Amino acid sequence: NLTAIDQSTDTCTNNFATMNPLDNYYAQATFSEGNLKVATASSPTTYVTSTIGVTPNFKCYWEAKFDTTQSGNGEIGMVDKVTTGASAGGGASRLYYQRNGISVNDLGQVWGNNSNTGQSLGSLSTSDIICFAWDGTNNALYIRKNGDAWVNSGNPASGSSKTGAFVTPDSNITIFQAMGDQAGNTNSTASINLGSPPYSISSGNQDGNGYGNFEYAVPSGYFAINTKNLAEYG
């Protein structure tokens, strides 16, 4: 009784990233849908990361959506460190607390480097898809909701000018896609599409190499997170 959603495009010669159940020391999260849907526990406040680190100079695209929206408790984004053991920084283990952590919470607010950026995607529902485009060459992240304009008038094609981007303090970093809690009083659930979606896609967009299955168009020069793309461009 498998449907198309239950089938992965992953092969023995090309592996797509998923979320990593081994990076689960603090989070005590549960993983489903091929490790692309994550539900956090109600007490810890932390995050989990993806299985493939995106190396510097790679430009990647991914999508995600919240399956629960609970007043700013959930967050989805990227970070340059895993949480296993104490590497995330003791009690300050929220995703957006990290120096190179950038996230969108389930209120649509964009956070980074332990502060609210003042930018927002507007209100989010469980049907809204958050789009991320990371320019590793220029340490710049672009974010939008659905097919809307990129937040802060962002332009993923702007290169070193980083027009409207959320910029990490450090350059030349390896980043991971991440999901977690901003508050520890409840659990959050999100689905992450790193090229092989855990939810229904109506439009079916691919990157320039023909990889991935995304709801919205992949910006030119950005690619799904898989081993072939990283070998070619990473």
Listing of model-derived features with the role each one plays in the protein:
Residues 1-234:
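PRY/SPRY (B30.2) beta-sandwich protein-interaction domains
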